[in-house]
Amino acid sequence: MRLIALPAFDDNYIWALIAADGRAIIVDPGQAEPVLAAAQHQGLVPSAVLLTHHHGDHIGGVAELQQRWPDLELFGPADERIPADAHQVGHGERLRLLDVEFQVLQVPGHTRSHIAFVADGYLFSGDTLFSLGCGRMFEGTAPQMFDSLQRLASLPGETLVCCGHEYTLANAAFALHVDPTNAALQRRQQEAQAMRHAARPTLPISLKSELATNPFLRTGRPEIRAAVAPRAAGELSSEVDVFAELRRWKDEFRS
């Protein structure tokens, strides 16, 4: 299997995991056009679509893809805002698609029903875990999002994170504001700048690298707590408190 990132909108990625015969599993097709173009120019033939959550920039292309490939199978979370013909999958379930086993993880926070998929060494994290960041909490709570990130952080370090947006440079600016002496983070920013200058995706990225540089996965570190503490209205009695304040800070941050 090979993996390609299909850029969509301004900063989205649609992920395609492609078998040797061209059949492909598509993750979060917010637009149909990038998938249709890949089918035309690269011989890609979608056989299944995986949906992490209901937002339009992740599911907006589904109907057009179904028109082109009527036998396309859909899999997504149990949520009335997901296309009704999708197979509903939940935490711990396993799917076998194109001889690859996908594990479903429940990761609420960004939305109440958000899920992630793990397969073949890849983590398709949607808008839960980003490169050097995490998603906004539109429907979930800080404890939910913290637990979801911890669940993803427990995966093997060599797992490659395939998230839904190209946010690395924007997230690096905030991460360095919080953790300015982190040498690994400084290197990642420089590498990401070079990659974007060359019009290359900064993804996927190893979970090991994220654990060393992403402040939202480092809320137990004393330097992160120390950076957050002056902003907190009350005592930071747990990592969840640190995370919640860090997320509020990110929401307000302007580089």
Swiss-Prot record:
<feature type="binding site">
    <location>
        <position position="127"/>
    </location>
    <ligand>
        <name>Zn(2+) 2</name>
    </ligand>
</feature>
<comment type="subunit">
    <text>Monomer.</text>
</comment>
<dbReference type="InterPro" id="IPR036866">
    <property type="entry name" value="RibonucZ/Hydroxyglut_hydro"/>
</dbReference>
<comment type="function">
    <text>Thiolesterase that catalyzes the hydrolysis of S-D-lactoyl-glutathione to form glutathione and D-lactic acid.</text>
</comment>
<comment type="pathway">
    <text>Secondary metabolite metabolism; methylglyoxal degradation; (R)-lactate from methylglyoxal: step 2/2.</text>
</comment>
<dbReference type="GO" id="GO:0046872">
    <property type="term" value="F:metal ion binding"/>
</dbReference>
<feature type="binding site">
    <location>
        <position position="53"/>
    </location>
    <ligand>
        <name>Zn(2+) 1</name>
    </ligand>
</feature>
<feature type="binding site">
    <location>
        <position position="165"/>
    </location>
    <ligand>
        <name>Zn(2+) 2</name>
    </ligand>
</feature>
<comment type="similarity">
    <text>Belongs to the metallo-beta-lactamase superfamily. Glyoxalase II family.</text>
</comment>
<dbReference type="Pfam" id="PF00753">
    <property type="entry name" value="Lactamase_B"/>
</dbReference>
<keyword id="KW-0378">Hydrolase</keyword>
<dbReference type="GO" id="GO:0019243">
    <property type="term" value="P:methylglyoxal catabolic process to D-lactate via S-lactoyl-glutathione"/>
</dbReference>
<feature type="binding site">
    <location>
        <position position="55"/>
    </location>
    <ligand>
        <name>Zn(2+) 1</name>
    </ligand>
</feature>
<keyword id="KW-0479">Metal-binding</keyword>
<dbReference type="Pfam" id="PF16123">
    <property type="entry name" value="HAGH_C"/>
</dbReference>
<protein>
    <recommendedName>
        <fullName>Hydroxyacylglutathione hydrolase</fullName>
        <ecNumber>3.1.2.6</ecNumber>
    </recommendedName>
</protein>
<feature type="binding site">
    <location>
        <position position="57"/>
    </location>
    <ligand>
        <name>Zn(2+) 2</name>
    </ligand>
</feature>
<dbReference type="InterPro" id="IPR017782">
    <property type="entry name" value="Hydroxyacylglutathione_Hdrlase"/>
</dbReference>
<dbReference type="InterPro" id="IPR001279">
    <property type="entry name" value="Metallo-B-lactamas"/>
</dbReference>
<feature type="binding site">
    <location>
        <position position="58"/>
    </location>
    <ligand>
        <name>Zn(2+) 2</name>
    </ligand>
</feature>
<keyword id="KW-0862">Zinc</keyword>
<feature type="binding site">
    <location>
        <position position="110"/>
    </location>
    <ligand>
        <name>Zn(2+) 1</name>
    </ligand>
</feature>
<feature type="binding site">
    <location>
        <position position="127"/>
    </location>
    <ligand>
        <name>Zn(2+) 1</name>
    </ligand>
</feature>
<dbReference type="InterPro" id="IPR032282">
    <property type="entry name" value="HAGH_C"/>
</dbReference>
<dbReference type="InterPro" id="IPR050110">
    <property type="entry name" value="Glyoxalase_II_hydrolase"/>
</dbReference>
<dbReference type="GO" id="GO:0004416">
    <property type="term" value="F:hydroxyacylglutathione hydrolase activity"/>
</dbReference>
<dbReference type="InterPro" id="IPR035680">
    <property type="entry name" value="Clx_II_MBL"/>
</dbReference>
